[in-house]
Regions:
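Conserved H-loop
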Residues: 150-154, 162
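Ser/Thr-centered flexible coil motifs
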Residues: 1, 83, 175, 189-191
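Phosphate/diphosphate-binding loops
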Residues: 184-200
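Short glycine-/small-residue-rich flexible loop motifs, especially phosphate/cofactor-binding loops
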Residues: 133, 160, 180
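P-loop NTPase motor domains
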Residues: 1-141, 145, 154-157, 197-202, ...
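Conserved AAA+ ATPase core "coupling" helix
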Residues: 176-184
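A short beta-strand-to-loop transition that corresponds to the Sensor-1 phosphate-sensing loop
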Residues: 146-150, 173-176
């Protein structure tokens, strides 16, 4: 309830309400929310936790308006060099931005999520990705998730439903430690199982 009230007040200071036309208004940033929380009884701890995202190391990424247009034919978001603590937050923020744009302007798109297991480690992230997997077709969106380790991906209860909602599944060479899980998950025959164990890396199998 405290956070809900803080969010309402944060948008209100920017003259943004549920009934207003806010398309031309500047949206608030995290530091605006922090300022409101500091003045609300019982919200002091939340304000303190936000501080490292508004004035600390991560402020340059999170405490600013979104400025990435999605109009180009190819848009790449790289989080490779981010601190490990920030990666799940960054991936979630990026996917949320993309998903909002997809629903607002409907046209054929392809969303590729590499290292998807990072997002699957967190309940809110896996739930979000499953929601996209189930609803993407409605908005002319194709979703591709990529993960090097099936076991990490399936560690989340949402992993198998995401795979089930995939119309095409591509399997590369697998490690002996993971092959039994892969066989069970994808209903592979023994021949297919051993093919994945013996497959060469980066070479045409006909060579």
């Amino acid at each position: 309830a405290v956070l809900d009230e803080a969010l309402i007040q944060t948008y209100a200071i920017k003259d943004i309400t549920p009934d207003s036309d806010f398309s031309s208004k500047t949206p608030p940033v995290l530091s605006d929310l922090q300022n409101i929380l500091e003045g609300l009884t019982g919200a002091e701890s939340m304000a303190i936790r936000l501080k490292k995202y508004t004035t600390g190391t991560f402020a340059g990424f999170l405490n600013m308006p979104t400025n990435v247009p999605l109009d180009n034919n190819l848009v790449v978001f790289s989080i490779r060099d981010m601190e490990e603590e920030l990666r799940p937050i960054a991936m979630y923020s990026i996917l949320n931005h993309v998903w909002t744009s997809v629903r607002r302007v409907q046209k054929k798109r392809l969303l590729i999520v590499d290292e998807a297991w990072w997002l699957m480690k967190y309940d809110i992230g896996s739930e979000f990705l499953l929601n996209i997997a189930k609803r993407a077709r409605k908005y002319y969106l194709g979703l591709t998730t990529i993960s090097q380790d099936v076991q990490d991906f399936l560690a989340s209860p949402k992993g198998r439903p995401i795979i089930t909602n995939s119309s095409i599944q591509v399997l590369m060479k697998q490690s002996p430690a993971a092959i039994d899980v892969v066989q069970q998950t994808f209903n592979l025959t023994d021949a297919e199982k051993y093919y994945l164990l013996e497959a060469r890396v980066g070479l045409n199998q006909s060579q």
